[in-house]
Each structure stands twice: as structure tokens, then as C-alpha cells.
A protein has these predicted regions:
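Conserved beta-propeller blade signature
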Residues: 95-97, 167-170, 219-223, 275-279, ...
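Hydrophobic core register within WD40 beta-propeller blades
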Residues: 88, 161, 211, 264-267, ...
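Surface loop/turn motifs at the tips and blade-to-blade linkers of beta-strand repeat domains
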Residues: 78-81, 150-155, 195-203, 256-260, ...
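Asp-box/WD-like beta-propeller blade repeats and closely related beta-sheet repeat scaffolds
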Residues: 144-167, 172-214
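Residue-level detector of Asp-centered blade-edge/turn motifs that repeat once per structural unit
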Residues: 91-93, 163-165, 213-217, 271-273, ...
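C-terminal motif of bacterial Sec signal peptides marking the signal peptidase cleavage site
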Residues: 22-25
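Blade-level signature of beta-propeller repeat domains, shared across WD40, Kelch, NHL, RCC1
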Residues: 416-445
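Beta-propeller domain segments
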Residues: 28-69, 107-109, 118-123, 128-130, ...
Length: 447
């Protein structure tokens, strides 16, 4: 990533230019986000904009600071000086894989595309793409890696990882690749084989491809985001996108497992019921409180509304012609996270290593908003579960990424739980992986 010290003046100048264009002149003041968290979120009337209002958090360095954690927890940097870390994955032997990645260059078809690029640059999201996976190894169990190696490189905007037996799968933006892996291996030099193509460029609006193996290892599940906000690039560009794929691991054949999910950036199995759950980024540009991003169970064959509707049968008038047949069966998501928080990280609690209040539930990394006031997200929350379903309000677990001056030291992305039960957080603006653990428990691998 370009060094923050040298890039901030250039980024600030761009931000001033954006403001001068009057792009932030619309009323974007939102309601209390707490009103949009849970099973029955506030869904106010929508507002349409010629150009979206822009509210951007200015990136600054962490320096000697760290994120803030709730009582009973502690946090330290597992690894710093990374290059735009987007996701983390823990191997069976405890090694941690860090995906350092960014999206491919996007084409500009309309003024809004240019604005999007400016927003991403100003927010620190347009870093140089390392296209690699770095391995971190802690040999003495003190929670601090003493080995750091390039595990796999020359990838194409990778995001998701899944290990099944001795096959390591990497979801590049345009394909799932398979690599041979042996326990304890610190690098892979073998050329990978393609399992299946994935929807990629030239637009590739949502480039991240989340990845999860089925419990029996026979299938892979892939989150494939839409190619636009809400159909403006033509629905022909959305073929098999805004969907969760099921891929046969033996043949590479795939089917759409669920559709109408605008951007499913994280997939997990709920441990007590065995059901598939996902986090999703919903649409923009119809107001500061629309549409809430969400956490939901995923039904085989289910349709979740995008682009025609949201939260069941709430129509989006920007999409014409409508599909009343699809809208009629659109599923209401289980749990709203509030609007524009941009959930990009998802991990189910392991049931050990954290205080008892975190024994059952989901951790969600909220990357943060760019189009509402006040800013929303920029934290990691915990949604408690009971009997396999959300059972209460989301709780702040890790904050401090955003300060009171709307400066962002970092932005949480991918999450993982290590063998000790500690929570790992990829921070793609601070270029750090943070490790959050119990303040009273020394690192000890789970049996």
C-alpha cells in the first residue's frame, strides 16, 4: 500500500475537490442506528439522489494506538506492515493465512463510477494490490508470530480460502483455484488448477468472493456479489451474480444455491443447527437509513429481493421492469445490522477462549459507511445466538477504528477465530491483523 504519510496530502486534496463539486450537499443525516438492528428494523421512506451524498472518514496512522475492546478482553497486533489485508484463515495446525488483496481496476462508464473511485481512494481502499497470501506462525504459543513467509502469490484479487483435506482452495475474483497442501507447509510453489470460473470482469463491481466448504467436504459455497448497486449496468451483467453458489468439489459443476443477495461477503455454518448463514451488503443511494445490511440464514433456492425489493416486499422503484413473481417470494433477512455499515467479516464463536457471554453467536466486522451522517460501522460487533438464531441486540466488541474527529485509523474486514478462541481481525487501512483474546486467559490451543 502507498505509505499513508506520503499519500494523505494527495488524498485530502481529492476530498476537498469532491466537496467543492457539491456532492455532499444532500441531507444524509440518519436516524439512530440502534433502531435498525435486529429482526424488525426501522425502514423509513426512501429518497432518491441524482448523485449520492458523500461522507468519508479520513485515514490516519495508528501510531502507538490500538483498537479499543470491551471489558474482559485484550488486543494486540498479530502482524503489522501488511499490504491491504482483506481476510484471514486459520489452518488446522494454528498457522494463520492473511490474504493481501484489492479489486481489479474498474472501468468508468458514468460520473458515478468516477465518484466511487474517488471515495475508495480517499477512504484508503485503493491500495496497491499484493495479490498474495502471507503465512504467520506462532511456534511458542505466546500469541505473537515468530515466522512470517509468503505462502502463495501471483493471485488475482483473492479473498476467500477453504481447506479440505490436502486441497487448499482460493477464491480469486474470477475463479476458484486448487493447490496441494501438506500440514506444516510454509509456502506453496506448485501451480494451482482451476476448479471453476467465477463471474469476473470487465466490470466486476463487487469483486470479493467469499468461500466456505461444506461440513462433509463435498461442496464449496461461494458468495458472488452483484455487478452494480441496483441494476444500472443492465441485468444481463448480473447473470448468476448477487448469489451464493454451490460448487461440486469433485467436478467443479455449480448451481445457484440462493439468489437476490446483493453482496454476500461472508459465509459460515451455525454450529448447533448446521444451517448456512451469510452477511450481506445491501444497496445504496436511497437514503441514510436504507437499506440495512444484514445477517441471515440462507435457504436452498431462497430469493432475498435484490434488485427488485428489499426486506421482503419493499419495492425499489429504480428497477424497471419489476418482477412481482420474484418479489412475492422474497425472504426477509433474519437480522438487520443497520444501514451502510458494510459487513465484510464474519465468524461464529468457537465457544471457548472468550468470556461466557460470547459462547454462542456471530462476530461481524463492519468496514464502515461512506454515504451517511453520522458515519456508521467501523467496528466489530457480536450478535448473540440462542437455539441457532439471533437472540438479542448486537454488542460492540472492538471499536476505536474511528475517532471523534471522523478520522479512521483502520477499518475491519475479514474475521477468523484461532485455535485458542481468540478473534483475528484484518484491518485493510491500518495494514494490520489484530488479535483479541480474553484478558485473563493465556493463549492455549483448543483440544
Amino acid at each position: 500500500m502507498t505509505d499513508i504519510k506520503t499519500s494523505l496530502p494527495r488524498i485530502a486534496a481529492i476530498g476537498i475537490a469532491v466537496s467543492a463539486l457539491g456532492l455532499a450537499g444532500c441531507d444524509d443525516t440518519g436516524a439512530d442506528p440502534k433502531l435498525q438492528i435486529g429482526a424488525n428494523p426501522l425502514l423509513p421512506p426512501l429518497h432518491q439522489y441524482l448523485l449520492p451524498p458523500i461522507r468519508i472518514a479520513t485515514p490516519v496512522e495508528w501510531g502507538s494506538q490500538t483498537p479499543k475492546v470491551t471489558q474482559g478482553l485484550q488486543v494486540h497486533a498479530l502482524a503489522a506492515g501488511l499490504q491491504h489485508p482483506r481476510s484471514v484463515y486459520v489452518l488446522p495446525n494454528g498457522d494463520v493465512l492473511v490474504v493481501e488483496s484489492n479489486g481489479p481496476k474498474a472501468p468508468v462508464f458514468r460520473p458515478k463510477d468516477l465518484i466511487t473511485g474517488v471515495v475508495q481512494l480517499f477512504a484508503g481502499a485503493k491500495a496497491k494490490d499484493a495479490n498474495r497470501i502471507t503465512l504467520l506462525r506462532d511456534t511458542n504459543g505466546d500469541g505473537i508470530p515468530d515466522q512470517r513467509t509468503v505462502f502463495l502469490d501471483h493471485l488475482n484479487s483473492p479473498f476467500g480460502i477453504a481447506l479440505v483435506g490436502h486441497d487448499l482452495y482460493v477464491a480469486n475474483t474470477d475463479a476458484i483455484m486448487r493447490y496441494p497442501y501438506q500440514d506444516g507447509q510454509t509456502s506453496i510453489t506448485a501451480k494451482g488448477t482451476k476448479l471453476t470460473d467465477l463471474p469476473g470482469g470487465p466490470i466486476d463491481h463487487h469483486w470479493t468472493k467469499s468461500l466456505l466448504a461444506s461440513p462433509d467436504g463435498s461442496k464449496l459455497y461461494v458468495g458472488v456479489g452483484s455487478n452494480c448497486n441496483v441494476g444500472e449496468n443492465g441485468l444481463q451483467a448480473e447473470y448468476e451474480r448477487a448469489a451464493i453458489w454451490e460448487v461440486d468439489r469433485a467436478t467443479g459443476a455449480h448451481r445457484v444455491f440462493a439468489s437476490g443477495v446483493r453482496n454476500p461477503t461472508g459465509l459460515q455454518w451455525e454450529p448447533t443447527t448446521g444451517k448456512l448463514w451469510a452477511i450481506a451488503n445491501e444497496r445504496d443511494e436511497i437514503g441514510p437509513d436504507l437499506v440495512p445490511d444484514y445477517l441471515t440464514s440462507v435457504q436452498d433456492g431462497g430469493f432475498y429481493g435484490w434488485p427488485y425489493s428489499y426486506y421482503g416486499q419493499h419495492l425499489d422503484p429504480r428497477v424497471q421492469p419489476q418482477r412481482p413473481d420474484l418479489v412475492a417470494r422474497a425472504i426477509v433477512p433474519d437480522y438487520a445490522l443497520s444501514s451502510h455499515v458494510a459487513p465484510l467479516g464474519f465468524a461464529m464463536s468457537s465457544g471457548h477462549g472468550f468470556p461466557a457471554s460470547y459462547e454462542s453467536g456471530a462476530f461481524v466486522g463492519e468496514h464502515g459507511s461512506w454515504d451517511r451522517t453520522p458515519l456508521n460501522g467501523y467496528k466489530v460487533v457480536f450478535v448473540p445466538f440462542k437455539d441457532g438464531k439471533p437472540s438479542g441486540p448486537a454488542q460492540d466488541v472492538v471499536t476505536g477504528f474511528l475517532d471523534t474527529n471522523n478520522h479512521t485509523h483502520g477499518r475491519p474486514v475479514g474475521l477468523a477465530v484461532d485455535r485458542t478462541g481468540a478473534l483475528l481481525i484484518a484491518d485493510d487501512v491500518g495494514n494490520t491483523v489484530w488479535r483479541v483474546s480474553s484478558a485473563t486467559t493465556a493463549p492455549k490451543p483448543a483440544s
